């Protein structure tokens, strides 16, 4: 088995979508960085890699057995053994995983560029391990609270976080079923549509707003998000946290 040593990780917990597991250039000063003293490295096929990176589903039993107690984290000068922790690659993507004792990839992290390069060199002439696992027969369903990757592609960490906040606010707005309110917000988004939306049904206006707002990110998106969250303490807190960030 291959091993990496002294690996810096920045865990993102409970992320089913790989786009939320930030690459090194998006790490922030207030992120908690940990040091893996030793961690096993596995090369798998692209299907299994994608499954691990973009799902929160059960890992293959044989994989878990192969990595069991083989990783160590260094904390306060102590070397602590980890239950199931490993780095996995298909030769293109790379992700570190810690199940925190479960059989699903609860915590995920990218590696720093120097260590990514090391992984590529180490697995270049290595055959991918074959693991049996049960794929969902139906394709993964994305929705407003778990957007599809193509909606998030090309955005910075801050933009992705704010876009997800906008979607949360739109989802909450959907529960109100208030025609006057949704017409107001659509007019905020597109003032020229004021007359057109006055006679539209709630569902039609909401769908139109969502369809138009779901692609890209702009100052217009940011303004709508800021106005939608105003007066809602939980959403406001998330907004403030992201806007304290000067970069990313």
Swiss-Prot record:
It comes from the Bacteria. Pfam families: DUF3603. InterPro entries: UPF0736 (IPR020909). Belongs to the UPF0736 family. This is UPF0736 protein Bcer98_0893.
